[in-house]
Regions:
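Polybasic, Ser/Thr-rich amphipathic helices
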Residues: 161-178
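Long, contiguous binding/interaction regions
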Residues: 2-10, 14-35, 46-50, 54, ...
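Secondary-structure transition/turn motif
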Residues: 39-44
């Protein structure tokens, strides 16, 4: 009995810039033991494989950069990078779109093969440099304006709440007479 199976192939239409001209291309994503990417641009085919799709995309980009081809997808943007947990726990099809000074959140996740604007493209080196800078930069959580409470508001709220005398509460509780 043969238990082998053909890996499922997902095809995506993407754009590339080749020597300054935008061209259409097809990405094929395959996942079995490893993650493989095959890019067909005109009559040329480039392929790569790795433990996860982020690694395969990085290997593919190395080949493309040698041929002056820019793949226009989110995974090629300067401020897009996966967290170590994404790399360790899955196929790394998503990564965070990061902003210097801010913590990456779930709503910042993007599909790395979604299209990007040509102006957002960055080389692997530029992307790695941004990620290193993001890691070194102190970060804060962005709070939504409508529900954020300032420290002053929290202090005022604390002052207006009646304080219970817990000693008095427990003293009367033991006698069965509650006051609190």
């Amino acid at each position: 009995m043969d238990y082998s199976f053909e890996p499922e192939i997902e095809k995506l239409n993407v754009s590339c810039i080749i020597n300054g001209v935008v061209d259409n291309a097809v990405l094929e994503l395959q996942e079995d033991n490893d993650c493989r990417i095959i890019l067909t641009v005109g009559n040329n085919t480039y392929s790569s494989g790795a433990e996860h799709f982020w690694g395969a995309l990085t290997e593919l980009r190395k080949q493309l950069e040698e041929h002056n081809i820019k793949l226009l997808c989110q995974g090629c943007c300067m401020n897009v990078y996966p967290s170590p947990m994404i790399l360790d726990m899955g196929d790394a099809r998503k990564a965070y779109k990061m902003k210097l000074g801010y913590t990456a959140k779930m709503e910042d996740l993007v599909f790395i093969f979604d299209p990007c604007d040509p102006d957002d493209y960055a080389s692997i080196e530029e992307q790695d440099r941004f990620y290193d800078e993001w890691k070194r930069t102190p970060r804060i959580l962005e709070k939504p304006n409508d529900s954020a409470k300032t420290d002053a508001n929290l202090k005022d709220e604390h002052k207006t709440k009646p304080k219970k005398n817990w000693f008095q509460f427990w003293k009367h509780k033991s006698t069965g007479k509650q006051t609190g």
